[in-house]
Amino acid sequence: MEGARADFARPDLIRFCWAVIPSLWRPSFYLRELDRDRLICLPVMLPQTTILVTGAAGALGRVVFASLQREGYRVRGFDRLCCPWSDPMDWVTGALQSAQDCQRALQGVGIVIHLAAVPDDAPFESDLMPSNILGLHYLLEAAKESGVQRILMASTGQVVWEPLNHGPWPVRAHVASSPLSWYALTKVFAEEAGKVMARDFGMDVMMVRLGACPRSPEHAQQIGADPIARDVYFSPGDLAQFFKLAVSMPWQGFHCLNAASRPLDQERLSLGEAKDLLGYEPVDQWPDAVEAYWS
């Protein structure tokens, strides 16, 4: 058998992989070189892999959860609120601030999409600290104990507030942080925690610096009145596309990427890294499909 594999011509094997493997494994695979004459296909994610979406009842979480489920992925929601859909779902109702709830939610999970957070500036001790700091700690510890290999965590463009507002544009993800608020500082903490998980524990971690995602009609009005916010608008459709690619494409280690839709005027957040790593190509621009976030 080993000799037969060695005799399999490389071009034929590559064509075989592209033709056959996607129909067997969803959604992608690595081609890893074993020696000069052989390649082996390694699936990025088997159909049995469960993806946990935290904050799945929120505006962003609902979009990501529903999109992945429509694509045929096995998805589990984790939120303090009950499942917003009437159909039976794999759902854990619990608190991010509870280590036990995080452990329960992560049982059997292979990939985590962490969207749960207090999403705006708020009292630090009562709101931001329990959810965005302590809750993140509990989640990452539970992920480590459960053997999770890939984690995608929401950050924010607010961590680079100074260049985002004053240039030079487009702002790349490697620039030094200049957080707007205590909320943005919690996301700086999350980015550094992600580096620790990748460096010390071998996890594949992606920090996603989200553009403007309106959670209500009032929030959408604020974005519509701000030319910079309009340029970093992140539509529901592009949000779904981004996370589907981040789940399915082969990447390893730590990455920090900007994520937004097409700008109306000026590219404020560089999308080059996301295009290069994931093949992400935004389709929408402000205000395309904005109502889908809350309808």
Identify the meaning behind each predicted range.
Residues 138-180:
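Conserved Rossmann-fold NAD(P)-dependent oxidoreductase catalytic core, especially the SDR/UDP-sugar
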Residues 212-217, 233-254:
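Alpha-helical substrate-binding/gating segment
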Residues 52-70:
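N-terminal Rossmann NAD(P)H-binding glycine-rich loop of SDR-like oxidoreductase domains
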